[in-house]
Regions:
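Active-site core segments that coordinate phosphate-bearing ligands/cofactors
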Residues: 1-93, 98-172
Length: 172
């Protein structure tokens, strides 16, 4: 989704794409990020993406913000299907973790603390060990680089938007 958006909007870098998209603080739009079908939490290889709520006042920045929100909501959709209870913390790695704004958006949409680690080497192993119930303290000496606390003022906003997100796919 992010590669597609960067290419279509002709951003020269991800940094510029993120910076532009976060100039807007909220968006009335909704984005379903099913550009190549969907495999989780539902299986539908024919599912397609959608940008809902667009009008003549919609600009590139609003669309960017909405695409990023849609990516976060799709992750939340998977997490809700997978977990009985939402976790209190998630470790974020990869390219999007380089954007502080995206990390904060992720925390706000999920209403979960997002943790970045100083050392990301062997992070996949950490995930496997954690999912097996082996305590992080016993296996690694990773330290937190930064924590992103969810903005409680956005809790209701994103809860309503997520409910709309959940209902949007089946109605298309």
């Amino acid at each position: 989704n992010l590669d597609w958006f960067k290419e279509v909007m002709e951003y020269p870098s991800y940094e510029e794409m993120f910076n532009n998209s976060f100039e807007v603080t909220t968006s009335k739009l909704l984005y379903l990020p099913y550009l190549k079908g969907e495999r989780s939490p539902f299986i539908d290889p024919l599912a397609r993406g959608a940008l809902i709520g667009i009008d003549t006042q919609t600009d590139k920045k609003q669309i960017g913000r909405t695409v990023l929100e849609g990516v976060c909501m799709a992750f939340k959709h998977c997490l809700v299907a997978l977990c009985e209870d939402m976790p209190k913390q998630l470790i974020l790695t990869g390219g999007t973790s380089r954007s502080r704004s995206f990390c904060q958006l992720f925390a706000d949409v999920l209403q979960v603390e997002i943790v970045l680690l100083n050392e990301q080497q062997n992070i996949g192993l950490l995930g496997v060990l954690t999912s097996c119930g082996i305590e992080k303290k016993k296996t690694t000496n990773h330290e937190n680089k930064e924590n992103f606390i969810p903005n409680k003022n956005l809790k209701n906003y994103y809860a309503k938007k997520y409910t709309t997100f959940q209902h949007a796919y089946p109605t298309l």
